[in-house]
């Protein structure tokens, strides 16, 4: 590791320079290089890059971990930490810790996820809107957020205001969803999880909320199901709903046909992949933090991906261990798992996780100080300030961590075990059990050296099932825990590792390999007469196909004497024989038995004190009965949650409702523009300059867009204004102009006349062209693709182009599929989730 770096004086590097250097670091893997530079390289608030390769990032992280380690006995040094991180070989921080540790340019949290809520039920408008503001404040600092809606009174119940009756859950789902869509996090929207108890009288409305794919597009939704409901549904009995859901004297009660509602959950999951299901009694029964409910640790919701159930104002940071790196002599008959090295590294990973909590507390303190010093009125700052103080309190009290794993599929293949078989599942459970015991051993050791989390009480935990399994597996460890306590209230999870696995060049999380071989297409140069045409697209463009291989399938070939120099020209028949001989044969995402996979998840879950985020990917032609079988099996075998995704279930883009057309051109219906249409404001950076986009909407869909540089002396719009109207005005001489109108905080209408005159003519003309395409109804995904394909000479215009793409992507509904091939697995299964193009097959994401 280099020793002459000066952390206080970073040197700026260009994007292309960083990509080229990182491509060499990743042995020519340009996808891994571009993902790392785009998402994880050190950047300032203007997007300037200060790291060339992941080595620089790992040195940055190692230096900060060493600084914290020096506070405690037996510290790890920088070199020791760096070697664990280097080349993503052993220990991989995920998301926030990778981008934020040692980043002094931005006041942002290191936490991946948060949950918010009220200490006491609060279903007033004040309580509902405070939740909305807290959600936005967390998302602006890169946090994913979850919260529960079960405290909101059901539809039709009386309220003591002029409305007389409650609107119920769904309008507030839409409100929280819209807030998520509006908050930019490094070019993408925030991530949100909304949950509701099945016991709530509005549960059916909640379950149906996303059947219309134009609704609640900025949130994942999951229904919290209790054991009583499951027993009633499977037995065909009645189930009682009430509000408040935990009250001994509810204000409202109703009985329902549990089987009918269960069938609706299954149908909607089959049809649109939502809602997800959380088995809430299992979560609470297994939750160690809930042993401290009297201290505020009552679990109420999960983070957006579902792997961390949390209490209000608690947070978590994620880190994954690369299991493949512990296989000695991989892909040979002598292959074995190095449990001794694994145990040592689990202890070090837990120390690093605890150090990251200290680093997070420093970041939170900076955020609190920044808010306190802001010039805005105290009453404006109050909610955000109190929010971060609550987060600081919960982080100090519990010191929660999120240690997980990745490369499960590759580890099993390297050992000669076929994913999904009983032998492979048994070994996977053995590894997870070892991880759990060593993580608990490490946290007990840290409690002795550093002190236990401040509310530890062994008596409160003694009946917890997870603690019981620890006690039974290792009585001596349990005795030490009773004596010294634990450093951390809860520690383990298995989170999605989409982009993480791209950089470690392994399978993701506990998932199998998607395919060991897939095909990519390359456009043929018209002058290349010898190219073999494999595909011609709608525009007449010709493509050739070539094979792309999973990194570790190639390692298996090399370890077993195959001539890998033949790979680019190999015949399909010979390649199929090679695949059939490999441990990946019959063990891909499409090969394994889906119900067996859920059973494997349930067995591993016994040794994970939080939860596991897994989506069961199903082919398009599966029946609803199979989805029901997957969900029922998940409950029976102890899973804490389950989500399914049936291929193509959300295919297509939204079609506006039919409206009276003003005219038709060449068979194309064109909607007449009203004089005034609603508009959203999207602000973005073009280089170092502040730019703005006005997006005019028809039926919630972009109809026109005007963009340019913000000139405050000519066009001042308060930062908190994000909505208004674009008004088309016809002058006496026949010319037209566009005005922007908004309502300020005092309720007065403000109009900015002729916004076109305020923008550079070149940008205005490009925006007019894009608006013309939007008005003719081209799907937003196609418009974004069209803009992405523009090759413009000016760097300023190219930066502007990225801002326009970002603005329009906010209006692409989750689940909207594109014809794009996934750059990781090569499948045409790319769909938009939270504004990010995500592969529904392998988990690759352009954003997250």
Labelled PLM ranges:
Residues 243-245, 345-392, 396, 418-497, ...:
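Internal maturation/activation junctions in enzymes
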Residues 3-5, 15-27, 111-345, 349, ...:
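Active-site cavity-forming subdomains of large catalytic enzyme subunits
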Residues 225, 286, 291-293, 303, ...:
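Terminal amphipathic helices with adjacent charged low-complexity linkers/tails
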Residues 478-480, 656-697:
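Short, Gly/Pro- and small/polar-rich lid/capping loops
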């Amino acid at each position: 590791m280099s020793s002459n770096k000066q952390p206080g004086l970073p040197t700026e590097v260009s994007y292309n320079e960083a990509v080229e250097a990182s491509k060499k670091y990743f042995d020519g893997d340009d996808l891994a290089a571009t993902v790392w530079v785009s998402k994880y390289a050190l950047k300032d608030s203007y997007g300037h890059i200060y790291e060339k390769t992941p080595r620089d990032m790992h040195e940055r992280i190692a230096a900060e971990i060493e600084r914290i380690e020096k506070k405690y006995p037996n510290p790890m040094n920088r070199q020791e930490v760096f070697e664990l991180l280097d080349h993503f070989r052993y220990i991989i921080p995920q998301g926030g810790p990778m981008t934020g540790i040692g980043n002094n340019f931005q006041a942002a949290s290191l936490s991946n996820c948060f949950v918010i809520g009220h200490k006491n039920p609060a279903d007033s408008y004040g309580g509902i809107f405070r939740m909305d503001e807290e959600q936005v404040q967390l998302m602006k600092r890169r946090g994913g957020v979850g919260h529960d809606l079960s405290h909101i009174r059901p539809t039709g119940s009386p309220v003591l205001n002029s409305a007389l009756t409650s609107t119920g859950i769904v309008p507030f789902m839409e409100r929280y969803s819209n807030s998520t869509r509006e908050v930019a996090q490094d070019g993408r929207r925030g991530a949100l999880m909304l949950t509701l108890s099945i016991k709530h009288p509005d549960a059916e409305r909640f379950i149906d909320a996303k059947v219309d794919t134009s609704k609640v597009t900025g949130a994942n939704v999951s229904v919290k199901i209790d054991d009583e409901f499951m027993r009633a549904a499977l037995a065909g009995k009645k189930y009682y709903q009430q509000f408040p859901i935990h009250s001994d004297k509810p204000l409202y009660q109703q009985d329902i046909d549990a089987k009918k509602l269960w069938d609706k959950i299954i149908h909607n999951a089959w049809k649109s992949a939502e809602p997800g299901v959380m088995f809430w009694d299992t979560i609470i029964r297994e939750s160690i933090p809930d042993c401290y409910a009297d201290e505020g640790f009552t679990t109420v919701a999960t983070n957006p991906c579902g792997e961390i159930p949390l209490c209000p104002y608690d947070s978590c940071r994620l880190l994954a261990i690369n299991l493949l790196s512990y296989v000695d002599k991989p892909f040979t008959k002598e292959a074995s798992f190095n449990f001794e090295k694994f145990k040592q590294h689990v202890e070090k990973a837990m120390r690093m996780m605890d150090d990251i909590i200290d680093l997070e507390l420093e970041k939170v303190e900076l955020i609190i100080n920044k808010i306190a010093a802001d010039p805005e009125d105290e009453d404006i700052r109050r909610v955000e300030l109190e929010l971060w103080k609550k987060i600081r309190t919960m982080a100090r009290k519990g010191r929660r961590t999120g240690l997980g794993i990745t490369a499960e599929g590759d580890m099993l293949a390297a050992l000669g075990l076929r994913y999904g078989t009983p032998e492979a599942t048994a070994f996977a459970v053995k590894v997870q059990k070892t991880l759990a015991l060593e993580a608990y051993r490490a946290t007990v050791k840290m409690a002795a050296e550093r002190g236990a989390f401040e509310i530890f009480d062994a008596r409160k935990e003694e009946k917890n099932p997870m603690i019981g399994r620890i006690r039974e597996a290792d009585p001596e460890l349990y005795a030490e825990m009773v004596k010294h306590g634990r450093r951390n209230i809860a520690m383990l999870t298995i989170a999605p590792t989409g982009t993480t696995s791209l950089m470690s060049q392994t399978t993701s999380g506990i998932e199998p390999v998607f395919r060991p071989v897939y095909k990519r297409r390359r456009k043929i140069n018209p002058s290349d007469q010898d190219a073999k045409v494999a595909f011609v697209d709608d525009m007449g463009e010709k493509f050739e196909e070539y094979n792309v291989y999973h990194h570790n399938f190639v390692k298996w070939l090399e370890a077993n004497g195959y001539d890998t120099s033949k790979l680019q020209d190999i015949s399909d028949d010979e390649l199929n024989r090679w695949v059939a001989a490999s441990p990946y044969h019959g063990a891909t995402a499409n090969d394994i038995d889906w119900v067996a996979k859920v059973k494997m998840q349930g067995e591993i879950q016994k040794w994970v004190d939080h939860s596991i985020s897994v989506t069961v990917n199903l082919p398009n032609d599966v029946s609803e009965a199979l989805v029901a079988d997957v969900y029922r099996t998940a409950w029976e075998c102890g899973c804490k949650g389950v989500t399914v995704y049936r291929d193509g279930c959300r295919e297509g883009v939204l079609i506006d409702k039919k409206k009276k057309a003003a005219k038709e051109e060449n068979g194309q219906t064109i909607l007449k523009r009203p004089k005034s249409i609603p508009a959203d404001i999207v602000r973005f950076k073009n280089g170092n300059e502040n730019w703005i986009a006005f997006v005019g909407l028809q039926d919630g869909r972009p109809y026109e867009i005007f963009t340019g540089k913000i000139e405050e002396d000519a066009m001042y719009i308060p930062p908190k204004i994000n909505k208004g109207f674009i008004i088309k005005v016809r002058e006496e001489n026949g010319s037209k102009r566009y005005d922007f109108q908004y309502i300020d905080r005092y309720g007065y209408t403000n109009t900015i006349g002729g916004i076109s005159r305020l923008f550079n003519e070149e940008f205005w003309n490009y925006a007019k062209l894009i608006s013309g395409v939007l008005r003719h109804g081209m799907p937003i995904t196609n418009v974004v693709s069209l803009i992405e394909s523009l090759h413009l000479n000016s760097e300023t215009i190219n930066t502007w182009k990225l801002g326009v793409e970002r603005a329009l992507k906010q209006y692409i509904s989750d689940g909207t599929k594109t014809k794009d091939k996934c750059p990781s697995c090569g499948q045409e299964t790319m769909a938009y989730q939270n504004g990010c193009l995500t592969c529904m097959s392998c988990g690759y994401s352009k954003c997250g």
